[in-house]
Amino acid sequence: MDIDIFEPVLTIGTVARKLNIAVQTIRMYEEEGLILAYKTETGRRMFSMHDLERLRCIRTMITEHGLNLSGIKKMMSLIPCWEFKGGFDEQCQKCPAYYEASGPCWTIKNVGPKCQNVDCRACPVYRIEVSCNKIKEVIFGHKSSENNKNQE
């Protein structure tokens, strides 16, 4: 049986205990747009294993690399979302996520046509592999076998 890492199965309290942080800290990260909580019909926040890894990475950026929330948001705003949504085109040029650097694309209001009516939690941009060690690859382009062959 495969585990769906995107399935929201962890409560906010469980995530807080696993990361040894306060529930309020997780809520603050959510308010800042660094994480997208799934909310049940009753408003209970739930998180996936993918969200847990994203939060671990955020904590690492803060505690080990000295970044603040603003710096993390700016860095996330550099993720080339169009690469995950079918490539750069005229629609992308009109999208505020392309020319704004205020935060990750899932925090932008009035997004372009490619992202209208899309559940951001299910979007490939939000679901990219979370790894603090690979953030440069995500921002500056995927490491591909073609690039490796060209360097040989």
Predicted feature descriptions by range:
Residues A22-T25, E31:
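Short coil turns linking two alpha-helices in DNA-binding domains
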Residues D2-I12, R17-K18, L36-T42, M49-E152:
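Arg/Lys-rich, alpha-helical DNA-contact motif
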Residues Y29, F47:
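Conserved active-site tyrosine of GNAT-family acetyltransferases
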